Amino acid sequence: MVQHKTNRGFRFCIFPGYNWCGPGCSGPGAPINRVDAACRDHDLCYQMHHNRCECDQAFLHRLRPLINPYTQEGRHARLLYNYMKLQTLFTCRF
């Protein structure tokens, strides 16, 4: 995990170099790949919608086709997918 100093304190980006994946890791900057773009869209969905479960479901659908054990991006997609799938079992029950 990478720590970046911000005006509000530290933020935690799950993967080095990513701009949008992780608690408090919401930009700035363009996404560096499709996984980072999915994280950005998930963050924006949370900001614009009250139904977080719909945002989480959309995030899972976006990550699933990106999973690939032979690429770093695909492995990151798998890690985020598995984490979110587990979290939604408790928070959204799907």
Which residues does each PLM region occupy?
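Extended terminal accessory/targeting regions
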Residues: 1-94
